[in-house]
């Protein structure tokens, strides 16, 4: 029989782990572990991405092969990925198998073996393949460049490992020991009874997580920068403003007023420009207000980004006031159970309008046809 519950119990430490659970109809459950302050913004560039690829490999409890076969036999699906803020582990399975997958996730956080041969044989190939696939998108290149010029370090680090600087197994192991602690770990369960989840976590290796403090990464906001990248394929132009967390609400109102990516089909100005959207990228310590214009035709992008800049400059106080309800809806649409968005939209968000007097600009693609920032 498959082992469904860890034999050891560390219930006192488990009480420090942040748990959120909700029951749902049907026989399917999902369990997500979010490790905050463990994303690409933290540590050496690329180390978080490589750590995410070590997850679900060999650990002290069982081999990667055994876990893969067992989880497949149970019909489970597992994944591990990195964001700028966090490492996120996700599992999907039948409800009755909750103890097994709680145990598996706890083993990842506390018992991963970090064997030397896994780095060149499994981890590096997987990480490099993911980066190569992402780099095939000019939009990805543009957003990476925008983060780099807007934040430089931290949130400006590359999202994925690019092979520029070698990273050792010891460096990955050290990063894991600093990131995987009770202050950083949150568990979200859907289709899960909260009492059951607490019980199984208390009986699993989750309880072996050490106590720790959440380290904040210093954030610097830089404006007035420009980046141009010549690349084959479609063209992309980005206007971006790095913003403080306190300003998320007013930039959500501005986004709704000109045309938010979360509100397609509206009559907002950007909806009249081919390939144009706006959004607010929100992180724990800062964010980015972004206007994006993409098209296979660079001339269309050139015309579109100029029109988009004109549209945002033309937004009136009345437009912002009228957009507050739309902004509330956009925020609600962004909020997910595993990643709640805590931004309060009210009338005050429209009283101090967001400004685009200074901004960062990125052009990727056929840059011979794309305008410079001072031409917008």
Swiss-Prot record:
Name the residues that span the membrane: none
Superkingdom to which the source organism belongs? Eukaryota
One GO BP: mitochondrial electron transport, ubiquinol to cytochrome c
Where is this protein found? Answer: Mitochondrion inner membrane
Membrane topology qualifier:
Peripheral membrane protein
Query: Pfam families, alphabetically?
Result: Peptidase_M16, Peptidase_M16_C
Keyword presence, Transit peptide = yes
- GO MF terms, alphabetically ordered: metal ion binding; ubiquinol-cytochrome-c reductase activity
The entry's function note states:
Component of the ubiquinol-cytochrome c oxidoreductase, a multisubunit transmembrane complex that is part of the mitochondrial electron transport chain which drives oxidative phosphorylation.
Summary of subunit composition and partner proteins = Component of the ubiquinol-cytochrome c oxidoreductase (cytochrome b-c1 complex, complex III, CIII), a multisubunit enzyme composed of 3 respiratory subunits cytochrome b, cytochrome c1 and Rieske protein, 2 core protein subunits, and additional low-molecular weight protein subunits. The complex exists as an obligatory dimer and forms supercomplexes (SCs) in the inner mitochondrial membrane with cytochrome c oxidase (complex IV, CIV).
Q: What is this protein called?
A: Cytochrome b-c1 complex subunit 2, mitochondrial
Q: Which organism is it from?
A: Debaryomyces hansenii (strain ATCC 36239 / CBS 767 / BCRC 21394 / JCM 1990 / NBRC 0083 / IGC 2968) (Yeast)
Q: What is the lineage of its organism?
A: Eukaryota, Fungi, Dikarya, Ascomycota, Saccharomycotina
Gene designation? QCR2
